[in-house]
Amino acid sequence: MIDSDGFRANVGIIICNKFGQVMWARRFGQHSWQFPQGGLDDGESVEEAMYRELYEEVGLRPEHVQILTSTRSWLRYRLPKRLVRQESKPVCIGQKQKWFLLQLKGHDNTINLNSSGHPEFDDWRWVSYWYPVRQVVSFKRDVYRKVMKEFASTTLALQTREFSKKRSKQRS
């Protein structure tokens, strides 16, 4: 779904663990790393697209995650001219994205990069919260910065809650 301004509707997914680290994935056969993302199909809600992409890209189902929050508005980035396919109609000049912050409820082994048979990623790791902002390709950096800033208080609350649990156990 490309809007009248040339932006493709898309969902972005940040998966965090109970320590506030985020899942960082390497694109299949490339050296670039990013968060899972993907376009909306016709007639699909944003949440339906998020769950579909979540399964297609990292093999997780709704029962494996908890939605913590989502962005208040759509965020946009433009593609570099070299990546715009002028021959396709309508021409897509970039992405407009609704982002979700999810917490993995299960174990790391529930992540399966080959769940769809056409993997988007060939490796993944947990990284510190702000790491992706410095590492993502430059044309996505501003969107990543905005998303991470919007979600920061939620992940900080996760980290604080986990730290408090550890201290309580140590005192017992």
Curated annotation (Swiss-Prot):
Its EC number is 3.6.1.-. Residues 6-149 form the Nudix hydrolase domain. GO terms for cellular component: cytoplasm. PROSITE patterns: NUDIX, NUDIX_BOX. Its cofactor is a divalent metal cation. The keyword Repeat does not apply. Keywords: Hydrolase. It holds the Pfam family NUDIX. One of its GO terms (biological process) is mRNA catabolic process. GO terms for molecular function: mRNA 5'-diphosphatase activity. InterPro entries: Nudix_hydrolase (IPR020476), NUDIX_hydrolase-like_dom_sf (IPR015797), NUDIX_hydrolase_CS (IPR020084), NUDIX_hydrolase_dom (IPR000086), RppH (IPR022927). Accelerates the degradation of transcripts by removing pyrophosphate from the 5'-end of triphosphorylated RNA, leading to a more labile monophosphorylated state that can stimulate subsequent ribonuclease cleavage. Belongs to the Nudix hydrolase family. RppH subfamily. NCBIfam families: PRK00714.1-1, PRK00714.1-3, PRK00714.1-4, PRK00714.1-5. This is RNA pyrophosphohydrolase. The gene is rppH.
